[in-house]
From Swiss-Prot:
Phylogenetic lineage: Bacteria, Bacillati, Bacillota, Bacilli, Lactobacillales
Protein name in the entry: Phosphate import ATP-binding protein PstB 2
GO biological process: phosphate ion transmembrane transport
CDD domains: ABC_PstB_phosphate_transporter
One GO molecular-function entry: ATP hydrolysis activity
Ranges of residues in domain ABC transporter: 21-262
Name of encoding gene: pstB2
Keyword Membrane: yes
């Protein structure tokens, strides 16, 4: 078994004006267990950043901390700063529902509501008091077009979301998330339940979406990270080991552990 120097780090930074999001000294605890260990990380606007690493390394925990989803876990505690538009959204006085409007989440498995395709998109808007049908129709069409689903469902908007394929359901969930106009999309292994064709379609959708959104994606699929991201970050045991342009991570990693992980020789 290879002995690695875990003090070895290579982490890029960006000019302040290009930042969509950043964390400073971010720690996440589940009870007494420290799952994320003081991560400083920056995300560039309108780029796709992939978070990779072995199971249990903390990448999903880190992702869920960015829009305060860990607040839903009783034993979770998050310290440090999560900086969005210069504001620390980890402050206890922040409205987490407002935060999640700006940092939308797409989960591992498609989770459409038990409603029509149309109502999946309009549900949050109607609850917020939007009643004008023309406005709602426009939100639905715009969101589904951005998620590359409109042409497939425009004649079936009032059918159940459960009539869609797995890949279509995931793109519906993306459409639902972007309908509230977030700046950032957080995706936790969004292709793990999809077949290769649906995965390819999802990646093509991501390429289009990054024109308007910043995307942060957790993936176990090295090929997907290499294909679909601009930047890649390697996590291990709650630490950020290496963070660089994706081509550098896969072709010229600075840390031996990173190189071994992406080449399948880790351990």
């Amino acid at each position: 078994m290879t002995e690695y120097n875990w003090n070895e780090r290579h982490i890029i930074t960006f000019p302040e004006e290009t930042l969509a999001l950043a964390t400073k000294d971010l720690h996440v605890y589940y009870g007494a267990k420290e799952a994320i260990k003081g991560i400083d990380m920056q995300f560039e606007k309108h780029k796709i950043t992939a978070l990779i690493g072995p199971s249990g390394c903390g990448k999903s925990t880190y992702l869920r901390s960015l829009n305060r989803m860990n607040d839903t876990i009783d034993i979770a505690r998050v310290t440090g700063e999560i900086l969005y538009q210069g504001i620390d959204v980890n402050r206890k006085d922040m409205n987490v529902y407002e935060i999640r409007k700006h940092l939308g989440m797409v989960f591992q498995r498609p989770n459409p509501f038990a409603k029509s395709i149309y109502k999946n998109i309009t549900f949050a808007h109607e609850r917020a008091g939007v009643k004008d049908k023309k406005v709602l129709d426009e939100i639905v069409e715009t969101s589904l077009k951005q998620a590359a689903l409109w042409d497939q469902v425009k004649d079936d908007l009032h059918k159940s979301a459960f009539t869609l394929s797995g890949g279509q359901q995931q793109r519906l969930c993306i459409a639902r998330a972007i309908s509230v106009k977030p700046d950032i999309l957080l995706m936790d292994e969004p292709a793990s339940a999809l077949d290769p064709i649906a995965t390819m379609q999802l990646e093509e959708t991501m390429f289009e979406l990054k024109k308007n959104y910043t995307i942060i994606i957790v993936t176990h699929n090295m090929q997907q990270a290499a294909r679909a991201s601009d930047y890649t970050a390697f996590f291990y045991l709650g630490n950020l080991i290496e963070y660089d342009k994706t081509r550098n991570i896969f072709q010229n990693a600075q840390c031996q552990s990173t190189n071994d992980y992406v080449s399948g020789h880790f351990g």
